[in-house]
Amino acid sequence: MLTKLETLEQVYALCKDDPVRPHLPAEWRIRSGREVYALKENEDIVAVICVAYMDEVPKSERDMKWPGLDVAVFYTVWSYKKGAGRKIVLEVAKHIKKVHTNVKRFVTLSPLTEMAERFHLRNGATLLAK
């Protein structure tokens, strides 16, 4: 089940597990133009994803200062169960298409690792920059 995390306490409890951007504060992740979702199975959280809405595709984390409307940026995702990361990306994209009809593009701000690149390309992504 997909759940939007809306309180600072909910997000703070999970931020410490973020393998890519643990330095981003919980309050930054849920302020205007940003959302955090958890995927649950039997009340256990199996994956987490953080989304920022922008007007253009960011080239780096620094480019995500000001929120926008047209681009959903999945800037960090982590999972506690094999396959749950892919599942949460697909479910959140589907949810955003229904709720944020103005979003025209979905991108990830993934770290430059071979594993991340293979994962995204295998799942239909287009590499925009290296």
Show the residue positions of the predicted features.
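Acyl-donor binding region in acyl/amide transferases
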Residues: 59-125
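Conserved catalytic-core motifs of GNAT/GCN5-like acyltransferases
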Residues: 126-130
